[in-house]
Amino acid sequence: MHNGVLANSRKEERSGILNIADHLRPMGYRVGLTGKSHFRLGQQQFDGIDGFTGNANGDIAEYDLSGVRTYIRETQSAGSPFCVFICSVHAHHPWTVGDESHFPHEQLRIPPHYVDTPATRKAIAIHAAEVEEFDRQVGDVRAMLNESKLENDTILIVLSEQGIAMPRGKWSPYDHGSRAVCIAHWPGHFVPKKTSAIAMYSDFVPTFIDFAGGQSQVPLDGKSLKSLWLDERDKHRQSAFISNVHPFWQKAIVTEQYKLIWTGFPNEDHIHSNFASTKFFGKAWSEWKEASEKNRDVAAKIIRVLHPKRYELYDIQNDPYEVHDLAENGQYQNVKLGLLAELKQLMADAGESLEPKQPQGKEKERTRRRKKR
């Protein structure tokens, strides 16, 4: 799954946008939500359900499914179908939940684009511990559906967060920051399988409408996943458009085989301010920089983070960590140019400028610095 154009660096308030409740409530569905929520677009409100915290930056480890159970029971008593969003805050920072000892630091596999330091291993371990807590929540939800005799009548969809908050992860167009896990479960209907089909978060609204037997009231960017999940086809999209969400102009296109990344201002330091804070990756980033002073390979990794080339091309099938850039390899020029043309077309279709622009947040930050001088 790819975040795609769900959120980009432009913070414009879009009018006329319908949320999933706007689509499902007219079809008789009750639509509820517990836990984390960001968006406020649409006309219909979600029914609030107690049990899961909405504070992604807190230390609350406990959760309670009794509110969800009650909500589902009430909808059944009323003869209404339901759509419930259980929005976990795991594995969002501060990574204080879960048992780190389940992931011994010395046994961890370090991705090749990371610098192997004690703080790096610590960050991976505590993140994994919180992912394990998320997995436990998913198991509890499955058990609840089974106890309620609903598992065979309910589609359960599990989505991960978009990536670990480390360099070239969250807030970046690289796969560790734009690819998410999607698991769809419906016993007797979905054939167990793993697919490499490309999909985007925007595909879920038409998918829900399709399974509910309805029709969209307005044109939608997404495409229903119903026939893919029912094993009626094995492909979904040719490509996905990725627009970076942190304050650096980066656009990307990904296919099943390749990813092309276009960086608008490669001479600027591409390091999110959060990585300099102790809340996020500050200690590990300091260790990376210190190691780069004595190690040429580490220095090269730092440069790849801070100053990505204007164009990067990766064979993500054979290079999932995106460490072997093919953009300047003559054998791949046709691939590069073809993807760049397709990327520009997707940008135009999405109403994006084809000229790199400094995001407003970046411009304001520079203005503040100039005023201080």
Label each PLM-derived region with a short phrase.
Residues 1-312, 320-348, 352-358, 363-373:
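Formylglycine-dependent sulfatase
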